[in-house]
């Protein structure tokens, strides 16, 4: 009995122990269940907090980004404004430069126009002054020389008569049968100088002889050219006289009748001389004859002395 009781007691004790253990387990489970719910709640809360924190962080990041963007855009806007201002200033400067250039161009044009006007005015004034001075020359200004006395007039008549008479005798009595001439119209003009104004530089032996020879040479060249080129006679006449004057200038033998000597050679219809024969007869021979007559006749006069110079 005792063993059976002991076994029953042990079974009961075991049952009690198991019950206690079960109760304890239930208690533990009951305790752990709330803990799990709390943990889940806490986890949820933590997750929510994390989400909130993330959201806050995101918001902060967004805010910071927006602030950064604003900070970035603000300098960019300011830079753009500065660039725009600089561009405007540059445009204004360019406009000012263009205006200045236009003003300078206008000023230059005005200056050029003024210069042209002034030049025209100066040209007109110079032309006016030139013609004023030109027509003033027509007035002369010097007194005319006094008339020669009767003695001088008498000797001029006598010497010129003798000089032309000698040439006429040679022309009509000596050379006419040989179809040559000895008397030219230009010798009459030479007679006026060497017999009427023997003191004139144009009447001296160099001028008388060399002037006629140079002019005859020019006239002969022009006449030969006229024959072979069929040039205009009018031009040939003008060239003969003008070139004869140039030749006399170069040889210091200006003698006004020399121009007539050159002209006669070109205008003569009947050419009684061939080639350059005209230079020797009648020009050189006639001028030397007149020189000899002047030397003889002029020096008979009391107040005359001929020549003043020879060469």
From Swiss-Prot:
Q: Which residues are glycosylated?
A: 8, 35, 38, 62, 76
Compositionally biased spans, kind Polar residues: 9-18
Which InterPro entries does its entry note? HPP
Q: Region Disordered: which residues? A: 1-113
Q: Has keyword Protein transport?
A: no
What is any one of the record's Gene Ontology cellular component terms?
membrane
Q: Does the keyword GTP-binding apply?
A: no
Q: How does it sit in the membrane?
A: Multi-pass membrane protein
Q: In which residue ranges is the amino acid composition biased (Low complexity)?
A: 37-67, 76-111
Annotated coiled-coil positions are 95-124
Per UniProt, subcellular location reads as: Membrane
* Record keywords, A-Z: Coiled coil, Glycoprotein, Membrane, Transmembrane, Transmembrane helix
Q: What is its main location?
A: membrane
**Residues spanning the membrane:** 150-170, 181-201, 208-228, 235-255, 276-296
User: What is this protein identified as?
Assistant: Transmembrane protein DDB_G0273707/DDB_G0273361
Q: Which organism is it from?
A: Dictyostelium discoideum
